[in-house]
């Protein structure tokens, strides 16, 4: 049976911590979809389309990874698209407390047997979050080594564009 996995987040921006989880998950499953969640409550740095394009470009070398976006319940998206695994990344025990609660709720909502698999972020990336990256970048700090090169270029270009306004 082909395994179709889903890894979700807002990815605004995609960080090296996200990349680490995606790269490792891509080796475990036949197909991996990076599901970009639309969250109107969050002020986004990049549009959904920009995030999707950046993720697709960054993940090209992996071969079996694609990006998509969705809104609404994760369980609805999983059931509609036939995923058998939901991958979640963990940085700390605080992440685990939240993620286990969500996994248990989702298990009630999934139509079929869908497993939630937790992958620990590598230690070098455990302190990285999209929020921290955005804050450091907005204050003029270096985010090199915190995000993939494609994302770094896009963030620098966005900053330059905003300075010109």
Cite the ranges covered by each PLM segment.
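Nucleotidyltransferase catalytic core that binds NTPs
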Residues: 1-165
